Design a protein with these regions (language model features):
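Non-catalytic terminal/interface segments that mediate subunit docking, oligomerization
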Residues: 85-106, 127, 142-146, 153, ...
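A glycine-rich helix N-cap at a beta->alpha junction
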Residues: 174-185, 268-275, 303-304, 633-648
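A short alpha/beta connector and helix-capping loop motif
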Residues: 254-279, 630, 637
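Conserved small/polar residues in nucleotide/adenosyl-binding loops
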Residues: 764-766
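Active-site phosphate/pyrophosphate-binding segments
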Residues: 366, 495, 635-747, 754
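Cofactor-binding active-site loop characterized by glycine-rich and histidine/acidic residues
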Residues: 85, 89-102, 106-116, 123-267, ...
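N-terminal amphipathic, basic-rich helices that act as targeting or association modules
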Residues: 2-171, 439, 514-518, 522, ...
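Long, well-ordered, tryptophan-enriched scaffold segments
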Residues: 278-505, 726-734
Length: 766
């Protein structure tokens, strides 16, 4: 009982953030006057005026030499106070029932699969913790593709939450019961469901592969930027399309997750929303057991220039926060580390009373009227639809910054003592009959005790209030998600014959294949048929490849245009940035460049517009460095050209082995949709490029053409008559000679870097 619990008088490091030194208030009366003044300004003139005054004071303090401690964190409470919450527009009761049914079907799908097929795998706990985050989005925010089929939001669903998306699609009538029974069994007669979002396996359903972890965040950032690129170049209106990325707090340890967030703020991508499910757990245990991951991420994203919205506590905590005039509750919330919060999840209310509130007598007094059961049921913010709705609504208000929502949840929410908040939650994929009964009862699923063990899927009658509401909400928002069109818009493309004369000009000259391919790329950017669709992508190597002449011709894309006079403005090939620029100059990031390639290479399915990416880079820094993103490109059916520059035995020998690429062709063989070539002559690169244009864009094939290009000058030979087909297939007869009285006949094979040696060898008399 509350009246027999004694407050903890000794501060302990156990379960708490280490204490920090704070300033002593030497004049409490003066402090209260300042606080009252600020409260008056907020009340009478609004938060904008208060913000201005505080900024002015901060600036004055700096001018007078007052050193203020850097503060990147706000208190461990919700960013949006109750009084600023918008009214919730939906039917809370119907939405709760729909969400509960989806929870059951998602859980039953995984448990059933592992009951009948031992070791099949799957994940329950991620969606269990994030169901509210998704359902508020599906019911009120996520825009479908609409009548055009290409005007919806782009959503990167967290890979481990895929069972929840399947369960919702089942209710919508897009998936059958047999589909759900075949979870992770794609080869069954009636199509099964892939483990994670895989467009290659489910081309009409998934759009974006988000596994392995870290891929979704970086690709979503560059997708949001590419949407702006399309709009600024006048190719497609994308202003109303949002990019949502759902990810986990543990996923933020992946370099790709946080590595490009500064680009998002630099490009003012207020069309981008990250939702981080902070359930405080990863596979092995706590994400930050001895710290506070929400505070850590808040500091990181704030420092990178993002809007940060914290959704930490549910509405049950509001009366306590309002009643606490001492500030001790907010202080206690900040003191407790994540590992201890995880402990509270699995403990009774009496433990929470003693170990959380019991630290201070005032807090025990605050909850003396609360039963232990009531304390147990006080939710985290990510499980409160009204708090989540308020966060999403604010994120939709564009202010020139991307937004991250840090939503605190419980991993395995609803799974009971065997899975809720436990370290084993991530790998949980089985449940006994008692656990199923408890889950059924907790979420009110109309399945009898006798049938629970069979794990049947449940779908309300078509004329039920739940089904009518579910379908009406999605119709209002433009249709179901995720969804991917399978029809491919084809386009008229130029042929090799259109460019043959340009190629023939090189015959007999000493040139590199890099120079040849850049010439073709420059011409293609001006081509009447496809010029505006070409997307040159370079990770800060344009001058290495001799592309600087394209700066003035087509411009470098910059969302704000060029706000300065470039130092080389008096030169012909000056560094020209423009809002409608065509080149994506990505800086030193092959990963970011590949993410742009993926966005451009899937524009045909995402936007209904064929864009043609040409990603040129140092060949050594391609497949072996960003192979996972290339695999994602293949999975999401991207198309385009990857050009591996300075390939083979480069003339840059002084650069060392890091620039001696003899194996990227071997790496390329690991990617099923990649067609890899090692040309030696410019006519070969030209034939391959125009073959790629014809097959990928003229005929609609899904492929990526990888073409190695070198920087060693070759004497450009004439193209042998009738060799086009052989070039595309990978082998053709370049030259032959008969030698009188020869003792035998030798066939020599060669390409790219070795071909000069092969040609010299062919002159030896046997």
């Amino acid at each position: 009982m509350a009246d027999v619990i004694k407050p903890q008088t000794n501060s302990t490091d156990k379960g708490e953030v280490p204490a920090v030194k704070v300033s002593v208030d030497v004049d409490p009366l003066e402090t209260s006057e300042w606080i009252e003044s600020l409260e008056y300004v907020i009340r009478s003139k609004g938060t904008d005026r208060a913000h201005f005054l505080l900024e002015t004071l901060e600036r004055l303090a700096a001018e007078k030499g007052v050193e203020l401690p850097f503060q990147s964190n706000t208190p461990y409470i919700n960013t949006i106070p109750t009084e600023r919450q918008p009214a919730y527009p939906g039917n809370r009761e119907l939405e709760r029932r729909i969400k509960s049914i989806i929870r059951w079907n998602a859980m039953a799908m995984v448990v059933r699969a592992n009951k009948y097929f031992e070791g099949l795998g799957g994940h329950i706990s991620t969606f269990a913790s994030s169901a509210t985050l998704y359902e508020v989005g599906f019911q009120h925010f996520f825009r479908g593709r609409g009548e055009s089929g290409y005007d919806g939001d782009h959503i990167y669903f967290q890979g481990h939450a895929s069972p929840g998306m399947y369960a919702r699609a089942f209710l919508e009538g897009r998936l059958t019961e047999e589909n759900l029974k075949n979870f992770r069994r794609e080869m069954q007669p009636e199509s099964g469901l892939s483990s994670y979002p895989h467009p290659w396996l489910m081309p009409s359903f998934w759009e974006y592969p988000t596994v392995s972890m870290g891929l979704g965040p970086i690709m979503s950032i560059y997708q949001a930027r590419f949407n702006r690129y399309l709009e600024n170049r006048g190719i497609k209106e994308t202003a109303n399309q949002r990019v949502w990325a759902f990810l986990g707090d543990g996923e933020c340890d992946e370099p790709e997750t946080l590595g490009a967030i500064s680009m998002a703020s630099r490009e003012k991508l207020d069309n981008l929303i990250f939702v981080i499910n902070c359930n405080l757990q990863r596979l092995d245990g706590p994400v930050r057991g001895n710290g506070k991951v929400i505070q850590e991420l808040e500091a990181i994203f704030k420092g990178a220039g993002w809007n940060v919205i914290k959704v930490v506590w549910g509405e049950e905590w509001e009366p306590l926060l309002a009643a606490d005039k001492t500030g001790l509750l907010s202080k206690r919330m900040m003191e407790v580390v994540d590992g201890q919060y995880q402990k509270y999840t699995g403990m009774p209310g009496s433990y929470i009373r003693e170990h959380f509130f019991g630290k201070y007598p005032e807090l025990l007094e605050l909850v003396k009227g609360y039963s232990d059961e009531r304390l147990e049921k006080m939710r985290r913010g990510g499980h409160d639809p009204e708090k989540v709705y308020a966060a999403y609504a604010q994120a939709m208000q564009q202010n020139g910054k991307p937004t991250v929502i840090l939503a605190k949840t419980i991993k395995g929410y609803g799974l009971g003592e065997s899975g809720e908040g436990r370290n084993i939650a991530h790998n949980k994929k089985k449940a006994n009959e008692q656990e199923l009964l408890e889950f059924r009862s907790r979420f009110g699923i109309p399945i009898s005790d006798e049938d629970v063990g069979k794990m049947p899927f449940y779908k309300p009658p078509e004329n039920s209030a739940e089904m009518k509401y579910l379908l009406a909400q999605r119709e209002k928002l433009g249709g179901s998600l995720p969804s991917r069109p399978t029809t491919v818009t084809k386009m008229e493309v130029p042929s090799f014959e259109d460019y043959r004369k340009i190629v023939e000009r090189d015959y007999g000259k000493d040139l590199s294949t890099t120079m040849g391919v850049v010439r073709i790329l420059s011409r293609l950017c001006k081509d009447k048929k496809i010029g505006k669709n070409v997307v040159p992508i370079v990770p800060d190597e344009s001058r290495t490849f001799g592309m600087e002449g394209m700066f003035r011709e087509v411009g470098i894309y910059a969302h704000a245009g060029q706000l300065y006079e470039p130092i080389d403005s008096d030169q012909l090939a000056y560094y020209k940035e423009a809002k409608n620029g065509q080149i994506l100059e990505e800086g030193i990031t092959e990963a970011g460049s590949m993410a742009s390639f993926n966005a451009a290479g899937t524009a045909y399915s995402a936007h209904g517009v064929n864009m043609i990416p040409f990603f040129i880079y140092y060949s050594m820094f391609g497949f072996q460095r960003i192979g996972d993103l290339v695999w994602a490109a293949a999975d999401m059916r991207a198309k385009g050209f990857m050009l591996g520059g300075t390939a083979g035995r480069t003339t840059l020998n002084g650069e060392g082995l890091q620039h001696q690429d003899g194996h990227s062709l071997l790496n390329a063989m690991a990617f099923p949709t990649v067609r890899a070539y090692d040309p030696a002559f410019n006519y070969e690169t030209a034939v391959l490029i125009f073959d790629g244009l014809k097959k990928m864009y003229g005929e609609g094939e899904t492929a990526i053409y990888y073409i190695m290009v070198g920087n060693e000058n070759y004497a450009m030979a004439e193209m042998p008559e009738g060799s086009e087909e052989g070039i595309v297939k990978g082998m053709y007869r370049f030259r032959s000679r008969d030698v009188k009285n020869a003792k035998g006949r030798v066939q020599l094979f060669g390409s790219g870097a070795i071909l000069n040696g092969v040609l010299k060898l062919s002159l030896i008399h046997i």
